Regions:
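Short beta-strand->alpha-helix linker/helix-N-cap micro-motif
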Residues: 22-90, 105-112, 132
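Alpha-helical tetratricopeptide repeat
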Residues: 174-189, 216
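Catalytic-center loop of serine/cysteine hydrolases
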Residues: 75-77, 83-179
Length: 222
């Protein structure tokens, strides 16, 4: 009897994390769109499209009530889209959400006017294809390029609050040079240049030694 009781307890303990995981809202964050930014080299803005999406995804995953759709599956789903990236809409987001098992899909865009940044995100309910809310870095203190990561953190907090999900755990804001280097690393990795990617990820870590996403990415391209 004691053996059966211990087995049931062990089973309950093993199942608890799985149940908690199933209760968490799954997000898919699609690459941001650059809306005619100026002030940095064009290739930097192209890189930021993936970089900002990854940083927002990481912030959403800091919520005890949030988790991310598989990054590889999301990339595959994007490759299957039938519209160009500049025309991603709610219907496209709904299809991608269904493919990757996401409850919510986030579409974003940004514009940099010589250092003044605007970052926007829209939440799509993947089950209905309905836009739920648009959020932005409305606080003037978060509209400088120097505050880019803080602006992304603000978007995550607004998204989670709109969905009545727990706020993300606190994390220090990253310096913008680290954000740019990380984004450039992602772009190089996506292009298949692992050596260049490793160099950029290391630059991101040099600028922000505690940058968890950069550490993970650097290990991935070794």
């Amino acid at each position: 009897m004691r053996s059966l009781t211990l087995s049931l307890v062990a089973c309950s303990i093993a199942m608890a994390p799985l149940a908690a995981q199933q209760d968490r809202a799954t997000f898919a964050v699609l690459p941001f769109q650059n809306e005619q930014s100026f002030g940095l080299p064009p290739e930097t803005y192209v890189a930021l499209e993936s970089g900002l999406a990854q940083l927002l995804a990481s912030e959403l995953a800091r919520s005890p009530a949030g988790q991310l759709a598989d990054r590889g599956k999301t990339g595959e789903a994007l490759g299957k889209r039938t519209v160009p990236p500049t025309r991603l809409d709610a219907a496209s987001a709904q299809r991608i959400g269904a493919l990757v098992g996401a409850r919510y899909v986030v579409l974003g865009n940004f514009v940099d006017a010589y250092g003044k940044i605007r970052v926007n995100a829209r939440i799509v309910d993947a089950s209905s294809g309905r836009f739920l809310k648009a959020v932005s870095n409305d606080d003037p203190k978060l509209q400088s390029r120097d505050q880019l990561h803080r602006a992304v953190q603000s978007l995550a907090r607004q998204i989670l609050a709109e969905l009545s999900l727990a706020a993300p755990t606190e994390s220090p804001a990253l310096p913008t040079p680290a954000v740019i280097a990380f984004s450039q690393g992602l772009a190089a990795e996506e292009a298949g240049d692992r050596a260049a990617a490793a160099k950029h990820f290391q630059a991101a870590l040099d600028a922000a030694p505690g940058f968890a996403d950069a550490k993970e990415a650097a290990a991935r391209v070794r």
